A protein has these predicted regions:
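Helicase P-loop NTPase motor core
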Residues: 5-91, 118, 184, 366-369
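Conserved helicase C-terminal RecA-like lobe
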Residues: 113-326, 330-339
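Long, highly charged, low-complexity intrinsically disordered interaction regions
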Residues: 71-130
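C-terminal accessory regions
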Residues: 274-404, 416-429
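Short, charged, surface-exposed secondary-structure boundary motifs
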Residues: 102-106, 408, 417-418
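Conserved nucleotide-binding/hydrolysis micro-motifs of P-loop NTPases
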Residues: 6-10, 39, 75-78, 99-102, ...
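Helical mechanochemical/support elements of P-loop NTPase systems and associated helical scaffolds
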Residues: 6-12, 16-21, 50-53, 74-77, ...
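A short helix-turn-beta junction within AAA+ P-loop NTPase domains corresponding to the substrate/partner-engaging
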Residues: 1-3
Length: 429
């Protein structure tokens, strides 16, 4: 049995990481140890929705004063945050690899459809994407009919003015005409949702087995630029931003886990730690040898990300995506933290008498307040669980599940031990 020493991370990180990687079968029998202090426990930040993740990280970047890394499995995961950082003028370093997001089939197809919604006379564009939608007309027929398109005539006007179409074909053309007439009136987010859910593009993604994660990134970017015209222009600008790489010497770093190997940071935030993203595969008895090997590789990658942290490690997860329930579970979080995020002492006898503990110091309260950012879930002793919607100074606006929206003074609540961040607790069968 090999023993290796980790000189970088705290004991709480090393011990958890070592237990986590032991789940892999195809590895040398070795353990990691450290002589470093235990340090603070690993934190889980459970956001209410995926779309809150970029704004949460934006605030972290604004407050950043020491080496901090946002690490992710997929290169495209940084784009929503990169968009906000660039807009707000917040400095960052971006250890990018070549991104194929902007030229991927999903993104190219959806953006071309949006462009066509503003120029529905463009026959060439229409013939490039029509088969991806719920039109079900043959190319030969469409090409023949559109040969007679007049200069001032839309594609749909030409098709509906042709002779010899069957009633069902006319019905599909009219339905698509209605969809395209509506798209320019919608927000960019709603327009993308309409194309995917109601115009057949989602079926095309599934049938062609395209990378659906590109759609989530595109929706997140659309959510940050509501108007469709400016959204399409922003995509072009963001493509140029990704090539620049930010400021090389900035302490706030965005990086894939692969690119972070051999590096270390005072604080590490691992993002998108939800089943279906990281890990992208699930464990199970029916798992093929190929899937099992791929899952072990994802676990090794997660281990690398965890052990980039010298002192503070945070795992970002979320319960919903754009208001819809996401994947049920965060298996890597449970495995890393031993099924429960923070060990809780169970008392079985009478409570022992003890001297009253001193309350937190002003410095401790100030440090804790930095974690209470819009989008995080909190638990109040009196009001229960809620979502922190907004914050001005120490005044937080929180929407509680049971009692509605309230404004609270965070400093007072933290000093009295009345509020805390919602702990991650796994679902139990």
């Amino acid at each position: 049995l090999l023993m290796e020493t980790n000189y970088r991370s705290t004991r709480s990180i090393v011990e958890r990481a070592d237990a986590f990687i032991q789940r892999n079968q195809e590895r040398r029998p070795k353990h990691m140890r450290t002589d470093n202090p235990r340090g603070e426990p690993i934190r889980v930040v459970k956001l209410a929705d995926y779309r809150n993740q970029a704004s949460y990280l934006l605030q972290v970047a604004r407050d950043c004063q020491r080496p901090t890394a946002v690490l992710y499995r997929n290169n495209d995961s940084a784009l929503p945050l990169l968009d906000l950082l660039d807009r707000e003028g917040v400095p960052y370093a971006y250890r990018q690899r070549e991104s194929f997001f902007f030229t991927s089939p999903v993104v190219r197809g959806l953006t071309e459809i949006l462009h066509f919604a503003f120029d529905d006379c463009n026959r060439e564009s229409f013939l490039r994407f029509y088969y991806k939608l719920d039109l079900k007309l043959k190319k030969q027929l469409l090409t023949e009919l559109l040969r007679f398109q007049r200069e001032d005539e839309t594609v749909f006007e030409t098709l509906l003015g042709a002779d010899g179409l069957e009633p069902w074909q006319i019905g599909r053309i009219k339905a698509m005409q209605t969809h395209f007439a509506r798209l320019p009136q919608l927000t960019s987010f709603a327009a993308l949702q309409r194309i995917v859910k109601y115009m057949g593009y989602g079926d095309y993604i599934r049938e062609q087995k395209l990378d659906a994660s590109k759609l989530d990134i595109l929706l997140a970017l659309a959510n940050q630029t509501p108007e469709t015209g400016p959204f399409l222009a922003r995509l072009q600008a963001l493509r140029a931003v990704t090539a620049e790489g930010g400021q090389e010497d900035c302490p706030f770093v965005l990086s894939t886990i692969h690119a972070s190997k051999g590096l270390e940071y005072d604080r590490v935030l691992l993002i998108d730690v939800v089943d279906g993203v990281f890990p992208s595969l699930q464990e199970g008895e029916a798992q093929s040898p190929e899937d099992r090997a791929a899952l072990e590789e994802e676990r090794r990658l997660f281990y690398v990300g965890v052990t980039r942290a010298r002192g503070r490690l945070e795992l970002l997860t979320y319960g919903e995506k754009f208001g819809e329930p996401g994947e049920a579970g965060t298996s890597f979080v449970r495995q890393l933290l031993g099924e429960v995020a923070e060990p809780q002492e169970r008392l079985t006898g009478p409570l022992p008498r003890s001297k009253p503990e001193a309350g937190p110091t002003a410095e401790q309260i100030a440090a804790s307040e930095k974690d209470y950012l819009p989008g995080v879930e909190v638990v109040h002793k009196k009001f229960g669980r809620g979502l922190l919607r907004n914050r001005t100074g120490s005044i937080a606006t929180i929407a509680f599940r049971e009692v509605g929206v309230k404004k609270l003074d965070l400093t007072t609540c933290l000093r009295g031990g009345q509020i805390e961040l919602a702990h991650f607790l796994p679902n139990r069968a």
